[in-house]
């Protein structure tokens, strides 16, 4: 479904990022669904029809990968220049001096920028796993997307799975373990 979470729409609002929000999120009435009955719910707008071209790779993604590499090799200034370029194209302000000077703050800024720029393009899960981030972020969609915050969610929305380190990686196949005794099974299997 790729439904935008309330947290994502708030992140756009906090940045004053109407350009990317309007390109990614739409509040449209959906009369055919029991769970999304009105225009109070956010829907993905980035690819609005089944004939919309789907980009496999965008320049912004490549630039943000470069910024991430710079941030992880202690060049926060170089990473900030790239992020500021992308933020400028979206019509929002530059990063703070503190973010530009700190490798840790720059890594957070790059991850945040990837979230806003590449929203609903299939990168978020990989970003969170790469950074070993808080797994609860994966379940923000269960928080619902009713902008008024007044909906009561039934069991359809309440289904949750326990997320922990054991569920991030799949088990190594038994045949691989038997063929190479130097390979160890992933935790939890």
Where are these regions (language model features)?
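Acidic/polar-rich alpha-helix caps and helix-coil junctions
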Residues: 15-189
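Polar, glycine-rich mid-to-C-terminal structural blocks
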Residues: 1-3, 7-10
């Amino acid at each position: 479904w790729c439904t935008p979470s309330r947290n994502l729409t708030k992140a756009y609002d906090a940045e004053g990022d109407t350009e990317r929000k309007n390109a990614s999120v739409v509040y449209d009435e959906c009369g055919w669904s029991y769970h999304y009955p009105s225009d109070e719910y956010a829907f993905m707008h980035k690819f609005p029809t089944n004939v919309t071209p789907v980009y496999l790779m965008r320049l912004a993604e490549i630039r943000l990968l470069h910024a991430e590499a710079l941030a992880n090799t202690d060049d926060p200034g170089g990473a900030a220049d790239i992020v500021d370029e992308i933020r400028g194209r979206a019509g929002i302000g530059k990063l703070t001096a503190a973010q530009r000077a700190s490798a840790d703050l720059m890594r957070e800024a790059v991850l945040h920028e990837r979230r806003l720029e590449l929203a609903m393009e299939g990168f978020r899960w990989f970003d969170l796993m790469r950074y070993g981030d808080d797994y609860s972020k994966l379940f923000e969609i269960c928080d619902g997307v009713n902008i008024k915050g007044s909906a009561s969610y039934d069991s359809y929305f309440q289904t949750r799975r326990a997320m922990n380190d054991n569920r991030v990686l799949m088990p190594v196949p038994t045949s691989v373990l038997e063929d190479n005794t130097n390979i160890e099974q992933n935790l939890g299997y």
